From Swiss-Prot:
EC number(s) recorded for this UniProt protein: 2.4.2.21
UniProt entry keywords in alphabetical sequence: Cobalamin biosynthesis, Glycosyltransferase, Transferase
Record-stated family: Belongs to the CobT family.
SUPFAM superfamilies: Nicotinate mononucleotide:5,6-dimethylbenzimidazole phosphoribosyltransferase (CobT)
Pathway membership, UniProt: Nucleoside biosynthesis; alpha-ribazole biosynthesis; alpha-ribazole from 5,6-dimethylbenzimidazole: step 1/2
GO biological process, one term: cobalamin biosynthetic process
Residues forming the catalytic site: 317 (proton acceptor)
Name listed for the protein in its UniProt record: Nicotinate-nucleotide--dimethylbenzimidazole phosphoribosyltransferase
GO molecular function, one term: nicotinate-nucleotide-dimethylbenzimidazole phosphoribosyltransferase activity
InterPro entries linked: Nict_dMeBzImd_PRibTrfase, Nict_dMeBzImd_PRibTrfase_bact, Nict_dMeBzImd_PRibTrfase_N, Nict_dMeBzImd_PRibTrfase_sf
Amino acid sequence: MSLQWWRDTCREADPQMRRRAAERQDRLTKPRGSLGRLEQVAIDLAALQGRERPSLERIWVTVFAGDHGVVAEGISAYPQAVTGEMLRNFVRGGAAISVLARELGAGLEVVDLGTAFPLEALPGVRHLRLAAGTANFVEAPAMGAEQCLLALEAGRESVRRAEQAGSQLFIGGEMGIGNTTAAAAMACALLDAPASALVGPGTGLDASGVAHKAAVIERALALHGAHRADPFETLRRLGGLEIAALAGAYLACAQKGMVALVDGYICSVAALCAVRLNPACRDWLLFAHSGAEPGHRHVLEALAAQPLLDLGLRLGEGSGAALAVPLLRQACVLHAGMATFAEAAVSDRPA
């Protein structure tokens, strides 16, 4: 494993295919721009896939799981045992992402990077077990440097498996009690923003719980604040194993030329970290939705992202990204299947 592989060159979109796809959109039997953002989505996908008529038939979903030591500060409404129990639910097909992946015909893998209470014999889960969760980041860095590197590499390896399966779109999901706190702490550091502006209820905290979470994050920022300018240090000190894996996956997608569809708040923070590690990866990231967590909007703005959906989602797992896939597919189908003015013998607008 080469150190700092994430700095390697990212693939470039195909400008010729972008031009050809845009020209095709202008010839289709509709007023120019009348399909709104669906037109630009199709054009962007054409450039990224290097095909005038892109398609998204083969989807890959990986849910990365890891627990967080900061739960010891009382920042979550749920116990950490839920993480391992949800892994079982994922592979048995009962979780939201399991249902959605099945409906999409997508491959679904589950990677345990470090649950606090693992179910070791659980078939269908990749057990990497880099740690029994992260350290409590109000007392010490969440991860050691080697742990963080291994978690980044785990995301990269997942994309390699997706590539070997011929996948055209990668969706990363996450599961980990305490990970909205970790994501909010990272966002505060990366955006140089106060916790009060970015912290939300996560899995269901009341107002006093949210205030307590913000205070915990401020303590962590005071401890690790000297490293805010370094995205790797921010990731390892304030992040989580699953967040690092997501960042690694997004970077690998850009390097391999695979489009990544980013899910909610936690995934978007991982994407922001990935872009800070290698800005060129931004072109390969599409953003599925704007979630209910207040910090999500700030992260999306920092990434100049235009999410496809706004449904008040805050589940995670990759579920919001899975919900956006049919929209992307319909953009491709319209782009490829509509007739041009010439083909339909319909009068075009005057030149």
